[in-house]
Amino acid sequence: MIDVFPGVSSGGGAPSAQGDRFVHDRLPPRDQWPDLRYDRPELQIPDAANLVATLLDGAHARGWGDRPLLRSPARTLSYTQAAAEVNRIARVLTGELGLVPGNRVLLRGGNSVAMALAWLAVVKAGLVAVATMPLLRARELGDIIDKAQPTVALCDGKLLDELRTAQAEHPVLATIVPFNQDGVAGSLEARAAAQPADFTACPTAADDIALLAFTSGTTGKPKAVVHTHRDVLAACEAWPRHVLRATPDDIVMGSPPLAFTFGLGGMLVFPMWAGASVYYPDIAYTPEAMVRLIREVKATICYTAPTFYRQMAPFARAIGLPSLRACVSAGEGLPDATRQLWKDATGIEMT
């Protein structure tokens, strides 16, 4: 048994679609699982549920198809356009690369439209997303490969070197497909462009595995935290609904990477639940740059760490952030002094 911390529920009325039982078979004994309660009406997730089909494909039925979802300086994709791109990538994964539900796929990249599309395609296809922090080196990537045993990786073209070094020591990772490389033969974009824009979502059980989120390893080697489709959908029904009160008019910005569950929620799945949009810049954030981009993009919700809010405060005070209505902090302890400094600068009580 590998070091796995389950976030999975004990429900499970629908049959699993994941023929590859690698993760399922390595979960701890059921009596060691947490007791997760889904007793509120909005948490009555169907026993058969694919989170991407629910959030992305379901956007059309909710009238959000033409609304923007993924935004960057280079392009903006509506919910309908994003769904088509996700479908093409899912076809590459299952048709061209031969992956089957339950297989793990390593994802390596910073926050970008391409990274978001890749993650969504992996999960829609019933595969297990194993997203990794962009700063990880070959040795750290190797530890994750050892535990997750992915045969395929999707990697930002700017981050290939360390992953290729890890691959040389861990041949189970047979294939690396680069993305964010438009016009490059063999890239994910080139492969996807040759595929049709339709794909039937894998009929996953709600308790099938959606992702392995690796811890930072502060108490030893990183451990894999298991999240099911039900877990992610339940989080979407809780946080953006009750805390943020998110709406389709929200524009989300922030610094946490999609490989970090703080970033995955705040910078992708929570906006999707609300029909909102998320903006990924093409520059490295500095405190001043983030403040200026929030003002320029008219972002309404921001996610970052307490240290960054503290550093942003003087710039926010100087130029003002009239569009911003909610600020979420995580990743480290939030000192009361930082909370008060930010409130004095913006009038916003940090969450």
Regions found by a protein language model. Name each.
Residues 299-304, 313-351:
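Gly/Ser/Thr-rich phosphate-binding loop
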Residues 120-125, 147, 260, 269-273:
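Short hydrophobic alpha-helices that are characteristic scaffold elements of the AMP-binding
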Residues 75-77, 92-139, 257:
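Conserved AMP-binding/adenylate-forming
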Residues 53-81:
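AMP-dependent adenylate-forming
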Residues 178, 195-214, 221, 245-251:
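Conserved pre-ATP/AMP-binding loop-to-beta segment of ANL
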Residues 78-80, 203, 210-237:
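Conserved AMP-binding A3 loop
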Residues 233-251, 258-300, 315:
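Conserved AMP-binding/adenylation subdomain of ANL enzymes
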Residues 2-22, 124-191, 295-298:
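Structural core segment of the AMP-binding/adenylate-forming
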